[in-house]
Amino acid sequence: MPDLYAYTDGACSGNPGPGGWGVLMLAREGEAVVKERTLQGGEVLTTNNRMELMAAISALEALTRPTEITIVTDSAYVKNGVTTWIHGWKRNGWKTADRKPVKNAELWERLDAAQQRHKVVWRWIKGHAGHAENERADELARAGMAPFKTR
């Protein structure tokens, strides 16, 4: 059975501004890629953090059955949020430790629901540091943003 990876990225022109998200999904047997799928999308007025979340959500929602997957993101916001902060937010009724509403709560709730049926390993990598798969995800995110940018 191949190992499944999703490399996710978000992009925004202005923050807020037009934005996009991209996902490179790879099925690997050892070092060999046996299947590849790309996803992308965007919005006219959004933030970089929202696009990073949408990339991860879209990767998980694209899976048609319960799956073991490694999601690789260059967003510390997504990685820390989904592996650490979310537990307290849920306990506090989607409020932060200082009782303020969690930003992007509807996307965090969607991500939380999307990951429930899968076995997800979350991995953070440094962005724009020469990781080929992350660079592809960035290209997809920029392509997802392109239709929403005005010249």
Curated annotation (Swiss-Prot):
Positions annotated to bind Mg(2+) 2: D9, D138
Cofactor(s) listed in the protein's UniProt record: Mg(2+)
Positions with a binding annotation for Mg(2+) 1: D9, E52, D74
CDD domains: RNase_HI_prokaryote_like
Localization of this protein: Cytoplasm
The entry's keywords: Cytoplasm, Endonuclease, Hydrolase, Magnesium, Metal-binding, Nuclease
Catalysis: reaction(s): Endonucleolytic cleavage to 5'-phosphomonoester
GO biological process, one term: DNA replication, removal of RNA primer
Molecular function per GO: magnesium ion binding; nucleic acid binding; RNA-DNA hybrid ribonuclease activity
Listed GO CC annotations: cytoplasm
Enzyme Commission numbers on file: 3.1.26.4
Pfam assignment, any one: RNase_H
Domain RNase H type-1: 1-146
InterPro entries, per database record: RNase_H, RNaseH-like_sf, RNaseH_domain, RNaseH_sf, RNaseHI
Cofactor binding note of this UniProt entry: Binds 1 Mg(2+) ion per subunit. May bind a second metal ion at a regulatory site, or after substrate binding.
Record's function text: Endonuclease that specifically degrades the RNA of RNA-DNA hybrids.
UniProt record similarity statement: Belongs to the RNase H family.
Record's subunit section: Monomer.
Name of the protein in its database record: Ribonuclease H
Organism: Cereibacter sphaeroides (strain ATCC 17029 / ATH 2.4.9) (Rhodobacter sphaeroides)
Gene assigned in the entry: rnhA
